[in-house]
């Protein structure tokens, strides 16, 4: 079975963000604005994205 993948791009900084939002970005592997990562599309990743949806842009790969 082929798992779908998501490309996650950080578009806003973490200044003023809550602690759990910063930790979610770090868990996703994002540290800088315009940095992107590719992750599997699963429930854990979707939950992290939901926490920081206003700081990132998500595309299906």
From Swiss-Prot:
State any single GO MF term: structural constituent of ribosome
The superkingdom listed in its UniProt entry is Bacteria
Q: Does the keyword Kinase apply?
A: no
Q: Could you give one GO CC term from the UniProt record?
A: cytosolic large ribosomal subunit
**Which Pfam family, an example, fits this chain?**
Ribosomal_L30
Fetch the PANTHER family from UniProt: LARGE RIBOSOMAL SUBUNIT PROTEIN UL30M, MITOCHONDRIAL RIBOSOMAL PROTEIN L30
Protein name per its UniProtKB record: Large ribosomal subunit protein uL30
Which source organism does the UniProt entry give? Mycobacterium sp. (strain KMS)
């Amino acid at each position: 079975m082929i798992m779908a993948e998501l490309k996650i791009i950080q578009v806003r900084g973490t200044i003023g963000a809550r602690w759990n939002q910063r930790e979610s970005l770090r868990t996703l592997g994002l540290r800088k604005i315009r940095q992107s990562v590719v992750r599997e599309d699963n429930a854990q990743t979707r939950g992290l994205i939901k926490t920081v949806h206003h700081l990132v842009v998500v595309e299906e790969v």
